[in-house]
Design a protein with these regions (language model features):
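Detector for methionine-enriched segments
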Residues: 1, 49, 81, 128, ...
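N-terminal, intrinsically disordered, small/polar-rich Type III/flagellar export signal
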Residues: 3-114, 118
């Protein structure tokens, strides 16, 4: 397959046409800047791997080189999906060389137990990245806006922000009793797609001036990530045979949006919002964290039914006038609510709601304009990241 790509000549679409029914199927579609469309397909047919390659036009030497490098990412993505537990491995396909490639599309279908199918779809072009996962356990999606990289930070800053978000995802799946395998795929997709930074250090930004050139202080007050939206939703299950309306569910949404506007760079306004929402329902043994045993009899109808409704938000606002920072603020809120209904022999015995909320408000003007802020850039930046647990927001407020 790689030799055919390296040859560079056009390959008819009907070459090595695949049968309609295959066990596992993987496709990679590439559109070059010259307009050529290249499609690679690998499929498992009765235990034998076969392939199909097609190109709409001849490729030049640079295009062939780029496609050969992408083929390595294609193989890595395939290896991830065909492991013991399907995994998302897309980093090799996110390295889009805009000089030669317009867009990349990847699709995977992997057969699972009981005639189920796990799918992964990925798209990348000059303005966006998108990955979606679907299977018997549920679905997940990650969208990243790369139409402007003006507020994207350094690679190191993005790594810190991603690590912070991954910790939030772990807390959410634990609190909501979500599917850990599905969450792992979600985390992998989130991590791979959100690494959009090009700069190694902040000095690199000075070599690429733009209309909304951000100052060092601006970047300290922002996450460094490109704007994104991501969600994960677990397939509802009815674990209690006597009450099939009591579903076990898990849904989590998280996003970031950034606006940079104004009449000029000297009078710019920057606003960045991060938010998350967790909704989950699940059964446990009374007073415990493990699942109850149900066999359809009344004697096993002793359990707690939990309903989780959490949200978090972080807002940063920076206002400049005549080139000077006049206002800078941080507002963060974390709210958690858990309703616990206790049933004994199928009858409701107690119904309690445990709410918790904390807020943090800080004026960032002094930290961002003082000489000491140079020393504390990293510390200040780490306090910008979203927190979903009220207790953690309290701890942040005591240190910040």
């Amino acid at each position: 397959m790689l030799k055919q790509l390296g040859a560079g000549s056009a390959i008819p679409a009907e070459h090595a046409r695949l049968p309609d029914e295959v066990d596992n199927k993987f496709t990679l579609g590439i559109t070059t800047q010259s307009g050529a469309r290249v499609d690679l397909t690998l499929a498992d047919v009765d235990g034998e791997m076969i392939y199909q390659v097609s190109s709409s036009d001849e490729l030049d030497e640079d295009e062939r080189k780029v496609l050969s490098e992408l083929a390595k990412g294609f193989q890595a993505a395939i290896n991830g999906m065909t492991g013991t537990s399907p995994a998302v491995r897309l980093s090799g396909l996110t390295q889009l060389d805009g000089k030669f490639v317009q867009s990349i599309d990847f699709h995977a279908e992997v057969a699972g137990p009981d005639s189920t199918t796990q799918t992964l779809d990925f798209h990348i072009d000059q303005t966006m990245r998108k990955a979606s996962v679907a299977g018997p356990d549920g679905s997940a999606e990650v969208n990243v806006d790369t139409s402007t990289l003006e507020h994207a930070g350094t690679k190191q800053q993005q790594s810190k922000a991603i690590s912070s978000y991954l910790a939030q995802f772990d807390q959410a799946v634990s609190r909501g009793h979500g599917d850990k395998k599905l969450m792992t795929m979600f985390k992998d997709a989130f991590s791979d797609l959100n690494r959009t930074a090009i700069a190694e250090s902040r000095e690199d930004f000075l070599t690429k001036p733009s209309k909304w050139q951000l100052s060092s202080g601006d970047r300290t007050a922002l996450t460094g990530l490109s704007d994104f939206s991501a969600s994960i939703s677990q397939t509802p299950k009815s674990s209690n045979p006597r009450k099939d309306w009591e579903k076990d569910t898990f849904a989590y949404d998280v996003s970031q949006s950034t606006k940079i506007e104004g009449t000029s760079h000297e009078d710019r306004k920057i606003a960045q919002s991060q938010q998350s929402q967790l909704s989950a329902k699940f059964h446990t043994e009374i007073g415990k964290s493990g699942p109850p045993f149900f066999d359809g009899t009344l004697e096993t109808q002793n359990y707690d039914y939990h309903q989780i409704d959490d949200s978090a938000r972080s807002d940063v606002a920076l206002n400049y006038r005549l080139g000077k920072l006049k206002k800078a603020s941080l507002q963060q809120v974390a709210s958690q609510s858990e309703q616990v209904q206790t049933f004994i022999l199928g009858k409701l015995k107690s119904d309690k709601i445990n709410p918790s909320q904390q807020a943090l408000v800080r004026d960032l003007l002094a930290p961002l304009t003082s000489y000491e802020s140079i020393k504390g850039e990293d510390t200040l930046n780490e306090n910008i990241f979203l927190l979903g647990v009220p207790g953690e927001l309290v701890a942040r407020g005591q240190q910040f």
